[in-house]
Amino acid sequence: MEKMTAREVIVFCLMAIFAGIAVGIGGTASLISASRMGGGYGKILGGLLFSLGIYSIISFEMKLFTGMVAAIPKMGVKNMWKLPVCFVCNALGVALVAVLLTFSPIYAEVKVEAVKLIGGKLHSNTWALNALCSGALCGILITMSIWASHYAPAKGLSTTVGVILPIVVFAFCGFDHSVANMMYFYFLGEVSWHVVGYILLSIVGNAIGGVLLPLVVMLRGTEKDKSV
């Protein structure tokens, strides 16, 4: 188990809270884009604006749940505590943004768009399967984005494009990001087992999708070792 001092745990939690704040700000910009532009162009611009959050998280090495799940294959059982702690802190950061927005001039506009977005998903007849599968697709794209910061430079590719493009795609497609969803649910104002179930399924979906690429990379490394 990786030993962490009390100070390191506090820093970990603070960086996770700031990651939630970054996602909340990016999500807010995305909602405003959808509200004022609508259609495909609004979604594309919204995805680009949402990518600000992920780009900031990678640049400042913040702790985001959907980014940390990629480390699950090598994390070890005794370090798994970081995942729920990270998610809770991410959710606190997103909630802080939502509270601040309540006192801003764009509150009504953001709330209407957030309720429209998450309300439609929540009340679908296939909401459970949608949350799981949509969350998995989002998890795949988030891992691609975060890993691009490590792999792209080695291949002579643009790190910025590699980080931003998967985020634009997932936001454009409307895939479920469990942390961003927490802000949308805050504005929805509904507390029920239905909501809890949706949140949990999107978390599981993000985790499943997030570990797929790392597992394939590990398998590729194993196969390379066998061929030596």
What is the predicted function of each stretch?
Residues 1-228:
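Alpha-helical transmembrane segments and their helix-helix packing motifs
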